[in-house]
Amino acid sequence: MAEPSVESSSPGGSATSDDHEFDPSADMLVHDFDDERTLEEEEMMEGERNFNSEIEDLNRESDMPIQELLSLYGYDGTIPLQEDDDDEDEEEEEEEGEDDDDVDNDDNSGCSGENKEETIKDSSGQEDDTQSSNDDPAPSVASQDPQELIRPRRCKYFDTNSEIEEESEEDEDYIPSEDWKKEIMVGSMFQAEIPAGICRYKENEKVYENDDQLLWNPDVLPEDKVIEFLNEASRRTGDEKGLDAIPEGSHIKDNEQALYELVKCNFDTEESLRRLRFNVKAAREELSVWTEEECRNFEQGLKVYGKDFHVIQANKVRTRSVGECVAFYYMWKKSERYDFFAQQTRFGKKKYNLHPGVTDYMDRLLDESESAASSRAPSPPPTASNSSTSQSEREDSTTSSSNQNGLSANGPGDIPSKDEAKPEGLHINGPTGGKKTPHTDLDTNGYETESLSLDPKVAHSTSRSENDFEEKNERPLKRRRINSNGKESPGSSEFFQEANSHGKLEELETLDD
């Protein structure tokens, strides 16, 4: 029988092609099942393990000598130590080195051949050892020296790291230190060395000639006396005007002018108070009253230039300083003149559009936008009710004029309401007689039904007018709709088309009659 080829014997498909997926055979899937009972049995076995016996064994082994402990775990002490082997190797190398110095090149070549043979033997011996260790792992462990097992070996991890660090230090770029590691550069070692000749002033020379002027020293008088002095300085006499007449609160303000007077009087409170009462303007910067012309010019400049007080002072209010203009502005904003000014300039400038007393600015903004939109929107055209009202007013005027002249347009019938559409029938003009027909015997146009029924044309026209009148009553009148922007809605055009069509029909009826 021919043996099966390698390709057919491979369970995962052909060995030559790598495109096929791995397909396990039936023999491989026979034992491929997961039995949960084995896991449960292993858990039971682990649960039955006695930990007390393990602790006792460990305690017993701790007191045991090292030789007995090694023999207990299968290690023999008859194996020569590795250090002795190392010493022997070193001695052989030294002897070989001495022989190399005395022997010629030929001998060296021979020695090299012998060394090659020895290395081959050693390599073959190592291969035999590795094979035996693979076959029987326990003797390989036993072949190691017990002192080598016990002695902690030096880890080369730190050595490799040190080598890597040495290499990286040579190639690394400069990296600035982190913020928390930075040192505060304070001290003589961090000071700059200024060369001589740059500074214009000498060490004991003053920078400027003028002497300093002391304005206030808080260390001379205690705080209680200073507060009492400020209370006396701010007391009212009743003759104040302008800003000084405004009542102040109970809190104490730092009056710098009063404190400076106290320093000039060598901290004599009575003398400083006397000077303050004698020269009130020096202690209190009184704002002089503005004239009506100055106020009007200031408001006009505020309209034109805004809150640019330098330009306002230069062009409009030259009699006042810029500081006085600023102080007057804040007083003026709290007065009634500002309210009137805001109302007058509401549509001119948006910045004065809001009243100072208004807090809900959004409602005010919406109201103003709606009022502005309604003022810009065109007036709406007359609606259906307005057109009918105007038509009824015109007919009332014509009937009154015809009655005054002795003529009647629509007869002696009652005037229809403004919501009703008036179909126009026959118009018979002539003098009205004194005899009047009762209202119940008259038709919608004010004529007798008996006389009209005799004429076929009149009867036909009246029947058509009654049908049109019923249709108009059944169909509600469409009113014209206008959007908020003042544009006509699309539904309004339909109403005018319908009204025009009705008007044309009525004109045709009158022509036929």
Curated annotation (Swiss-Prot):
GO terms for biological process: chromatin remodeling; negative regulation of transcription by RNA polymerase II; regulation of DNA-templated transcription. GO terms for molecular function: histone deacetylase binding; transcription corepressor activity. Keywords: Nucleus, Repressor, Transcription, Transcription regulation. Residues 285-337 form the SANT domain. Residues 157-261 are annotated as: Interaction with HDAC1. Transmembrane segments: none annotated. Residues 1-174, 368-513 are annotated as: Disordered. It is found in: Nucleus. The keyword Cytoplasm does not apply. This is Mesoderm induction early response protein 1. It comes from Gallus gallus.
